[in-house]
């Protein structure tokens, strides 16, 4: 599971600044779920090689309603679900009574807590932070979130003790990036015209991704808001006799993993709780299901985003969709409760889908009735198609040919009077497909041309249901920083020339 880090503290200590600093490092979409608790934000971060979910909680001020009551309203569930709590304090303002009250509450929760003194820039940090040791929560870490100073070291120190869970996540990340590192070694002497070179590179990349692709058990996460028919869809897929054992709607804290088999294919259905509307969250029962839904998305191969045809697309649906795309997961859109609608209403729903979801035109859309079972069986065809596209192997030579065709049809733009040169492309990973393009000045390509390349590769490779990630590698000059070694003849000539220059200056 993806680790969860919660940011807590009184107002104006820099929680949101640190949240933005963490999520910006990967340019992640910050998914805002209004109504669960006001001013709560969730985002995905990648710092120091660690992937984790970060929660920005509302400020806690114990002077009005008491620390415990305010904590229960704003941050209790975040603390309960977090693996690590970062307790932010203001180094400039010093220790205040509200900090002491929050610290007392955190000690009672027996949760891993780290005191983080923010705003240490421009002051004697050691002397200003000494008083925070009175909180009794161990060492005090010093950062300046606005400038980013100390943030990487903080995350590395905080998350490293989590051990095997994070090491596994980091190993997956390293596995995805190993192909890029391998390609960097080829960059100076790789000949993409030579079939032997491309075959060797494909073989190296294939070894890196063989294990992940050979995993034939497809994990399907069914996500969406409550009352969209998510549980009914799970019941229809699994059968009633299975639901009695596994289904616990509205009360479970964890996502339920249910193995099943269909037509000889192994699946794991991940049943998740829903993301509720404003004012509909029962804190005593729901147990912060949003985090579990986000973790289920991270763990799945294919995500079924379930939408209620009668209510249309909500902000919660778009927030979940953003997190799915950011996680790089394959996607199938499921519009439920399609039965009983008039043709006019159906046309309106389809028009709204086309308008609001035009940026994910690669995903299949299914109109079903989970209650009556119509259209449910067709979902598995799209699931297998999306998974196959996300894990298909493509050779370097084919990707390079597609890159050339794309450049011939629409040349790269000029940058400072020089045209961007695209040399070759190779696979950089799978699930989602990663295409690495090498060239000169590629970091200066306009976003519009990057989208053009992404769409061209998708159309050429016929990838359905899975996002494509395009990464660009700048071609390094192998002679940069090196001086030519002169021959003896050149040295003698240089010596004569220097003598002539000195003589002419006299």
Swiss-Prot record:
InterPro entries: AAA+_ATPase, G_ENGA, GTP-bd, GTPase_Der, KH_dom-like, KH_dom-like_a/b, P-loop_NTPase, Small_GTP-bd. The keyword Repeat applies. It holds the Pfam family MMR_HSR1. Gene3D superfamilies: 3.30.300.20, P-loop containing nucleotide triphosphate hydrolases. GTP 2 binds at residues 224-231, 271-275, 336-339. Residues 392-476 form the KH-like domain. One of its GO terms (biological process) is ribosome biogenesis. GTP 1 binds at residues 9-16, 56-60, 118-121. Coiled coil: none annotated. Signal peptide: none annotated. GTPase that plays an essential role in the late steps of ribosome biogenesis. Associates with the 50S ribosomal subunit. Belongs to the TRAFAC class TrmE-Era-EngA-EngB-Septin-like GTPase superfamily. EngA (Der) GTPase family. This is GTPase Der. It comes from Actinobacillus pleuropneumoniae serotype 3 (strain JL03). The gene is der.
């Amino acid at each position: 599971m993806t680790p969860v880090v919660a940011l807590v503290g009184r107002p104006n200590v820099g929680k949101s600044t640190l949240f933005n600093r963490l999520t910006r490092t990967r340019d992640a979409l910050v998914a805002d779920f209004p109504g669960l608790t006001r001013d709560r934000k969730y985002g995905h971060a990648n710092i120091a090689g660690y992937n984790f979910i970060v929660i920005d909680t509302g400020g806690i001020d114990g002077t009005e309603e008491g620390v415990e009551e305010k904590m229960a309203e704003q941050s209790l569930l975040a603390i309960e679900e977090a693996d690590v709590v970062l307790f932010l304090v203001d180094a400039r303002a010093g220790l205040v009574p509200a900090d002491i009250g929050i610290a007392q509450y955190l000690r009672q929760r027996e949760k891993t807590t780290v005191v983080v003194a923010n705003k240490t820039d421009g002051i004697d940090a050691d002397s200003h932070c000494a008083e925070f040791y009175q909180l009794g929560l161990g060492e005090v870490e010093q950062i300046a979130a606005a400038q980013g100073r100390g943030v990487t070291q903080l995350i590395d120190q905080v998350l490293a003790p989590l051990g095997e869970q994070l090491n596994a996540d980091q190993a997956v990340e390293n596995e995805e990036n190993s192909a890029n590192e391998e390609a960097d070694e080829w960059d100076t002497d790789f000949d993409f015209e030579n079939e032997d070179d491309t075959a060797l590179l494909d073989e190296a990349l294939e070894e890196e991704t063989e294990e992940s692709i050979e995993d034939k058990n497809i994990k399907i996460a069914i996500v969406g808001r409550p009352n969209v028919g998510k549980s009914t869809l799970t019941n229809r897929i699994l059968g009633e006799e299975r639901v009695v054992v596994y289904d616990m709607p509205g009360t479970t804290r964890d996502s339920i993993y249910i193995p099943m088999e269909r037509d000889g294919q192994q699946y794991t259905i991940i049943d998740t709780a829903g993301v509720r509307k404003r004012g509909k969250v029962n804190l005593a029962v729901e147990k912060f299901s949003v985090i579990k839904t986000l973790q289920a998305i991270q763990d799945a191969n294919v995500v079924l985003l379930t939408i209620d045809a009668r209510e249309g697309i909500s902000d919660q649906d778009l927030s979940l969709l953003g997190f799915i795309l950011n996680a790089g997961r394959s996607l199938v859109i499921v519009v439920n409760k399609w039965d009983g609608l008039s043709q006019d209403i159906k046309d309106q729903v389809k028009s709204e889908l086309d308008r609001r979801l035009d940026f994910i035109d690669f995903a299949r859309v299914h109109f079903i009735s989970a209650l009556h079972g119509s259209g449910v069986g067709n979902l598995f065809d799209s699931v297998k198609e999306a998974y196959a596209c996300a894990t298909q192997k493509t050779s370097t030579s084919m990707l390079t040919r597609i890159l050339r065709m794309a450049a011939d049809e629409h040349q790269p733009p000029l940058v400072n009077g020089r045209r961007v040169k695209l040399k070759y492309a190779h696979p950089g990973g799978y699930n989602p497909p990663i295409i690495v393009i090498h060239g000169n000045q590629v970091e200066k390509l306009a976003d519009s041309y990057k989208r053009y390349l992404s769409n061209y590769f998708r159309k050429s490779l016929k990838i359905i249901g899975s996002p494509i990630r395009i990464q660009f590698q700048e071609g390094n000059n192998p002679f940069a920083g090196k001086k030519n070694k002169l021959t003896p003849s050149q040295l003698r000539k240089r010596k004569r020339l220097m003598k002539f220059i000195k003589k002419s200056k006299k």
